[in-house]
Amino acid sequence: MSVRRPQFSTTERVIKAVPFPPTRRLTLKEVFENGKPKMDLLKNHLVKEGRVEEEVALKIINDGAAILKQEKTMIEVEAPITVCGDVHGQFFDLMKLFEVGGSPSNTRYLFLGDYVDRGYFSIECVLYLWSLKINHPKTLFLLRGNHECRHLTEYFTFKQECRIKYSEMVYDACMHTFDCLPLAALLNQQFLCVHGGMSPEITCLEDIRKLDRFSEPPAFGPVCDLLWSDPLEDYGSEKTLEHYTHNTVRGCSYFFSYPAVCEFLQNNSLLSIIRAHEAQDAGYRMYRKNQATGFPSLITIFSAPNYLDVYNNKAAVLKYENNVMNIRQFNCSPHPYWLPNFMDVFTWSLPFVGEKVTEMLVNILNICSDEEMNVTDEEGATTGRKEVIKNKIRAIGKMARVFTVLREESENVLTLKGLTPTGTLPLGVLSGGKQTIETAKQEAAEEREAIRGFTIAHRIRSFEEARGLDRINERMPPRKEASYHHDAGRMHSHSHPPHPQASRRTDHGKKAL
């Protein structure tokens, strides 16, 4: 018995029309009422890919910064509360998160950082979350992630996104407000909530309270560790006695061990550490239980489903109420498509157009036969038309081959862009032709410790495969010659001193963000 396969039309579009984003930007008078943003209006406008006037964006960001600046470096929050992990510019999934977790008007929220970069709707996430903070300053809380800084937002996508959608002034305002974000939260006097993890320089909660957070995070030290550190890959079954080892995946900070966490929890009378920072296939992970309490010593929560549109992971939020902890998972939502690195469709289509135009020119020049090109003039001298036309054909033919390479490699270029942290191709790749592109692709795959059997042309089908290819993006990017300055003019060193407690180790950490 034959199985009938569904028939698809080859002459009609599956989706016949796409709504055009609103062209008019919302004004200050429209967005604000009694000094607070109108959340329903803003949400509906942003979901349609609408934008606001620059003065509206600046007011939301600066008003949010004023509230965040008044909060302590380690805030104290009470249950019931919903704890959320990385968002990474996935605005349409953030809307799904609030559907799953509950309306912010009657639900308490704690976000653990990484609101921007990698996704293409980061500024929408900032504007919406900061508007919620203005409306609910005592029930919605925001912590800093490792991506809320100048160094990473310049290296990845957020700075470019701000320039394209708004201006560099909006980006600078975001950097100022990121400097105001708290670094940790003490939940119900039971849980320490941070973005990354622990630090050998932090042995008690008071060490966190004393930290100066109002600056660009340095490349090392306790602030860096709170934002960047990870649990060991073999957390809970370590083969080393070291509490902290150098984080070879990040290129900065540390891996921390199960004994280090248990010791910290015991010394500070805590149940567990709740953190984000690493993608999880199920959206969360409960680590080995603390033998003294029977409760998981460490919990990772991740709230960006189908991360980068290739991970195929679920997202999750953690709801804590009446001493009961529940995990709610959710899948990704449809979202508008952006070409990599915010490329416009004209730039993307140039190789295709160029190939066809050069083909047409070659065909026009080839109309002349050999006999026509050998015609002599009245004085009997052979014209130079034959050589001139042949030279033109050769030149245009060479150009045609370049466009053909570009056209054939368009999809591969997209793939290579996705595997490079800056979203740009290595210098000289295109001028070297197809073979150079193939070589660059293979080098990219090797550099990222791609899993065995992976080829660039084939589609990424699993969480582990995506994580292996994206490993290079887990590292702290190389720093520029100039150090970053914060508002008071202090400078931070861009070198990383040797870790006194770091042993030589090649553990590979999990996917991180």
From Swiss-Prot:
One of its GO terms (cellular component) is mitochondrion. The lineage of its organism: Eukaryota, Metazoa, Chordata, Craniata, Vertebrata. It catalyses: O-phospho-L-seryl-[protein] + H2O = L-seryl-[protein] + phosphate; O-phospho-L-threonyl-[protein] + H2O = L-threonyl-[protein] + phosphate. Residues 344-366 are annotated as: Calcineurin B binding. Its EC number is 3.1.3.16. InterPro entries: Calcineurin-like_PHP_ApaH (IPR004843), Metallo-depent_PP-like (IPR029052), MPP_PP2B (IPR041751), PP2B (IPR043360), Ser/Thr-sp_prot-phosphatase (IPR006186). This is Serine/threonine-protein phosphatase 2B catalytic subunit gamma isoform. Activated by Ca(2+)-bound calmodulin following an increase in intracellular Ca(2+). At low Ca(2+) concentrations, the catalytic subunit (also known as calcineurin A) is inactive and is bound to the regulatory subunit (also known as calcineurin B) in which only two high-affinity binding sites are occupied by Ca(2+). Expressed in osteoblasts and bone marrow (at protein level). Expressed in the testis. Expressed in the sperm midpiece in a SPATA33-dependent manner (at protein level). The active site is at 147 (proton donor). Forms a complex composed of a calmodulin-dependent catalytic subunit (also known as calcineurin A) and a regulatory Ca(2+)-binding subunit (also known as calcineurin B). There are three catalytic subunits, each encoded by a separate gene (PPP3CA, PPP3CB, and PPP3CC) and two regulatory subunits which are also encoded by separate genes (PPP3R1 and PPP3R2). In response to an increase in Ca(2+) intracellular levels, forms a complex composed of PPP3CC/calcineurin A, calcineurin B and calmodulin. Its main location: mitochondrion. It is found in: Mitochondrion. GO terms for molecular function: calcium-dependent protein serine/threonine phosphatase activity; calmodulin binding; calmodulin-dependent protein phosphatase activity; metal ion binding. Calcium-dependent, calmodulin-stimulated protein phosphatase which plays an essential role in the transduction of intracellular Ca(2+)-mediated signals. Dephosphorylates and activates transcription factor NFATC1. Dephosphorylates and inactivates transcription factor ELK1. Dephosphorylates DARPP32. It holds the Pfam family Metallophos. It comes from Mus musculus (Mouse). The autoinhibitory domain prevents access to the catalytic site. The autoinhibitory segment prevents access to the substrate binding site. Fe cation binds at residues 86, 88, 114. Residues 400-407 are annotated as: Autoinhibitory segment. It comes from the Eukaryota. Its cofactor is Fe(3+); Zn(2+). Residues 385-399 are annotated as: Calmodulin-binding. Residues 472-513 are annotated as: Disordered. Residues 458-480 are annotated as: Autoinhibitory domain. Residues 472-490, 504-513 have a biased composition (Basic and acidic residues). Binds 1 Fe(3+) ion per subunit. Binds 1 zinc ion per subunit.
